[in-house]
Structure formats: C-alpha cells, structure tokens
Amino acid sequence: MDSSQYMLKATLTQMCLCSRGVRNVHSEHPQQQDSSLTLWRPWLLGAGDRELDGQQRRSGEADGVPTNTGPKGALGFQHPVRLYMPKSKTSEYLQHMGRKVLASFPVQATIHFYNDDSDSEEEDEEEEMEFYNYYQNCAANGVDSSRGSSDNYSVQGGPKRNIGSHAGSA
C-alpha cells in the first residue's frame, strides 16, 4: 500500500470516528484490527449516555419527582420495540392495518403475532354459562339433573327434539 492510500484510509477512519464522538484508540497502530469499536445500537447506552441519564435522574429527583425509568432510546422507547398483534388479525394486518401502524409508530419496531384464543374462550364461557343456567333451572324446578344421561339434553338447556321419522319413537 503506498503512502497516499494509507494516508487517505487513516484520514477517513479518523473522520468517521470523530463524527461519532469515538476516539481512535488504535491510531498509533493502524495495522491492528479495530475490534474494540462496536456499532451504535440505540438500546445500549454508551458512557456519555449513562452520564446524561444519571444527570437527568438527579435533576428530576431534585425537583421532588423521583424518576424510576429504565434506559430508554429514541423518543423514550426502550429498545428493541415489539408491537404485539393477535394471530386472528393477521389477514387484516397484511391487507392494510400493518402499514398504518408502522407508519405512525415513530421508531423502528417489529410486529410479533401471538396466539389469540379469545374467540374459543368466549365460546367455552358461553357453553359453561348455558350448562350452569340449565342446572340452576333444574334445581329451581325440583328436577333431578343427574337422573338422565347428558345425551338427552342439548347445549341450549332443554331436552333434545327428535326431528324426522324418529320423532314419535323417542
């Protein structure tokens, strides 16, 4: 490598490091791999960020308002930001809602789908309430609900009605 290319590389490296506010700790040995430098990630606080965060907490506590917030990144969000959406809304999300959510959300975020069994839970609760109401009605009317088999009663809380040719034989 000739000296002009070496000088250009050293100058570019120094400019990039200075623009990020990081000192070039290996300027004496440019041949060494620069493994101590890391990429900036908004959810990891640097030394300057920790000092600033500590000063902000102390100033808030001096005002009589204790601040008990964790480390936050851009716009007060703790990174990485995850938006949770039920799997039952997947098709709706893919059609139009996802673009609107991500466009209106001010930071980079990922959307995670979770199992949404609320529909089946609601159906189960309705069935339980119907059985409960049926047995309450039986108790109020003096009917022994344990007498017959459960096959003789429908979910709606009454005896099953035979439809068709078997109507008279039941």
From Swiss-Prot:
User: What GO terms are given for molecular function?
Assistant: transcription coregulator activity
Tissue specificity is: At neurula stage, expressed in the region close to the heart mesoderm. At the tailbud stage, expressed in the pharyngeal region.
Q: Name one GO cellular component term.
A: nucleus
Q: Which segments show compositional bias classed as Basic and acidic residues?
A: 51-61
Q: Looking at the Swiss-Prot or TrEMBL record, what is one Pfam family this protein matches?
A: Ripply
- UniProt biased composition (Polar residues): 142-155
Induction context = Up-regulated by retinoc acid (RA) in the pre-placodal ectoderm (PPE) during development.
Short sequence motif WRPW motif: positions: 40-43
Entry superkingdom? Eukaryota
Give disulfide pairs as residue numbers: none
GO biological process annotation, one example: cellular response to retinoic acid
Q: Where in the cell is it found?
A: Nucleus
> Region Ripply homology domain: which residues?
79-114
Main location per the UniProt record = nucleus
| Entry keyword set | Developmental protein, Nucleus, Repressor, Transcription, Transcription regulation
> Where is region (Disordered) located?
51-78, 142-170
Reproduce the free-text note on domains from the UniProt record: The Ripply homology domain and the WRPW motif are both necessary for its transcriptional corepressor activity on the transcription activator tbx1.
Q: What does this protein do?
A: Acts as a transcriptional corepressor. Negative regulator of the transcriptional activity of tbx1 that plays a key role in pharyngeal development. Plays a role in the formation of the anteroposterior (AP) axis during embryonic development; required to establish the posterolateral border of the pre-placodal ectoderm (PPE) acting downstream of the retinoic acid receptor (RAR) signaling.
Oligomer status and interactors: Interacts with tbx1 and tle4/grg4.
Q: Which family does it belong to?
A: Belongs to the ripply family.
The protein's name is Protein ripply3
